[in-house]
Curated annotation (Swiss-Prot):
NCBIfam families: A_tha_TIGR01569 (TIGR01569). Residues 1-15, 89-104, 176-195 are cytoplasmic. The chain crosses the membrane at residues 16-36, 68-88, 105-125, 155-175. The lineage of its organism: Eukaryota, Viridiplantae, Streptophyta, Embryophyta, Tracheophyta. Keywords: Cell membrane, Membrane, Transmembrane, Transmembrane helix. It comes from the Eukaryota. Homodimer and heterodimers. Residues 37-67, 126-154 are extracellular. This is CASP-like protein 1B1. It is found in: Cell membrane. Belongs to the Casparian strip membrane proteins (CASP) family. InterPro entries: CASP/CASPL, CASP_dom, CASPL. It is a multi-pass membrane protein.
């Protein structure tokens, strides 16, 4: 009876989990792509010799900042994880997701929550420095000069934090499925008699 109830709720929860994974995949992949392609080149007047301006061309790219490189790599890894889990959920219908498999999926989901959270927070810190600078460290702000670069970075951060929230929900659902499976197995097991 308990297995029948678990199977009935399992079909609906699998569809919801699949939808959440698709959304998380989309959010993290778009964050990785937007930040990975984030580049802006501007020419500025840096001085004058007489009446002739001296110009220099500067480029702002994501790979100039290690935190943004980590952000792109982490979002790509979480996207790949979600893609594998989606494929496993769609094409692995004949596989039984019990025991070690559910545990490994739950652990991988938690690791990916940690990874994407760390990457999004590191990138948010660097975005804050880029927007406002740091007078104590004498770091100048750049968003007043590279507005498009900063706007694209902000969009990538929004997508990444949406991915963090979705991965938290997915991780909670994975743990819930694991707990349900353990509860179902413990209620169907015959009680042992201790003399």
């Amino acid at each position: 009876m308990a297995k029948l109830a678990l199977a009935a709720t399992s079909g609906k929860s699998c569809k919801i989990l699949l939808g959440l994974r698709l959304l998380a995949f989309s959010a993290t992949l778009s964050a990785a792509i937007v930040m990975g392609l984030n580049k802006e080149t501007e020419t500025f007047v840096v001085g004058k010799v007489g009446n002739t301006p001296i110009k220099a061309t500067f480029t702002a790219k994501f790979d100039h900042t290690p935190a943004f490189v980590f952000f792109v790599v982490a979002n790509a890894m979480v996207s790949f994880h979600n893609l594998l889990m989606i494929a496993l959920q769609i094409f692995g219908g004949k596989m039984e997701f019990t025991g070690f498999r559910l545990l490994s999926v739950a652990i991988l989901d938690m690791l990916n929550v940690t990874l994407i959270s760390a990457a999004a927070n590191a990138a948010a810190f660097m975005a804050e420095v880029g927007k406002n600078g740091n007078k104590h460290a004498r770091w100048d702000k750049i968003c007043d000069r590279f507005a498009t670069y900063c706007d694209h970075g902000a969009g990538a951060l929004i997508a990444a934090f949406a991915g963090v929230i979705l991965m938290l929900i997915i991780s909670a659902a994975s743990i819930s499925r694991l707990a349900q499976q353990n509860k179902c197995c413990s209620t169907t097991a015959s009680p042992s008699v201790v003399p």
